[in-house]
Amino acid sequence: MLTVETRQAVNPDYAKTLDTEGLRRHFLANDMFRSGEIRLIYTHYDRFVMGGAVPNGAPLTLDKVEETKTPSFLDRREMGIVNIGETGTVSAGDETYTLNRGDVLYLGAGSRAVTFDGAGRFYITSCPAHRSLPAKLVSLADSKEVKLGATETSNKRTINQFIHPLVMESCQLVLGYTMLEDGSVWNTIPSHIHDRRMEAYLYFGMDEKSRVLHLMGEPQETRHLFISNEEGAISPPWSIHSGAGIGSYTFIWAMAGDNVDYTDMDFIQPGDLK
């Protein structure tokens, strides 16, 4: 079963007038992981798609998606898949890939139908691609590791870069995930924006009762979302994206836009936030 929800782009002047329900309706990515289903959110920010596939032992195939108006979803798109569950498989073209928990699979444009199987919980990201590039399976051990933060500032963390120029080639998609060390709660501090790219977060590995306070909005007009396990946030190019957790968590970040330069960001110091 395939379900697709469309999210329109929101400008910052309108966003700052929204109440809690309105903010969650536009920017919270939830209800993406249902057993036996593929559920996608099609955003108008760089035509980025995020979603989940939970085969639960019965294969699920993603092929034609009406919103793209192409014969197959990946005809003019690339895809990044992260397995946040148990071991599963992804088949595309004539190849089948085994993904353990934490593995990332990149599929280039023209990969045709994609089939998910096994016990995996697959997080899907996708954006338009101008050329076809080879598929690549990247394990945590093969990712580029970057240490940031400090215990004193409660933001000591490891950034693992997977779909990234230092690891592999993609067209527009950049993806990785960040793991916080014990005792640290803050991610992406100092905050930043990048007007050249949108970004999406997925928070996972959280206790049922735990929440992440996700900060968003223009630096002078910040807002917040309380986010549960396996929920995410859609971050427009004009918005900061930071958060603090009540308990441990990991988050997947994915970006699409004008470039794939991870360092292309404009930092906002805490004293400049309102």
Swiss-Prot record:
UniProt enzyme class: isomerase
Catalyses which reaction(s): 5-dehydro-4-deoxy-D-glucuronate = 3-deoxy-D-glycero-2,5-hexodiulosonate
Pathway note: Glycan metabolism; pectin degradation; 2-dehydro-3-deoxy-D-gluconate from pectin: step 4/5
Stored InterPro entries: KduI, KduI/IolB_isomerase, KduI_N, RmlC-like_jellyroll, RmlC_Cupin_sf
Binding residues annotated for Zn(2+), in chain numbering: 192, 194, 199, 241
UniProt cross-references to CDD domains, sorted A to Z: cupin_KduI_C (cd20491), cupin_KduI_N (cd20294)
Cofactor binding comment, as recorded: Binds 1 zinc ion per subunit.
EC number: 5.3.1.17
A UniProt-annotated Pfam family: KduI
Annotated keywords: Isomerase, Metal-binding, Zinc
GO BP: D-galacturonate catabolic process; D-glucuronate catabolic process; pectin catabolic process
MF annotations from Gene Ontology: 4-deoxy-L-threo-5-hexosulose-uronate ketol-isomerase activity; zinc ion binding
Top-rank taxon, per record: Bacteria
Cofactor (UniProt): Zn(2+)
Family designation: Belongs to the KduI family.
Function: Catalyzes the isomerization of 5-dehydro-4-deoxy-D-glucuronate to 3-deoxy-D-glycero-2,5-hexodiulosonate.
Protein name: 4-deoxy-L-threo-5-hexosulose-uronate ketol-isomerase
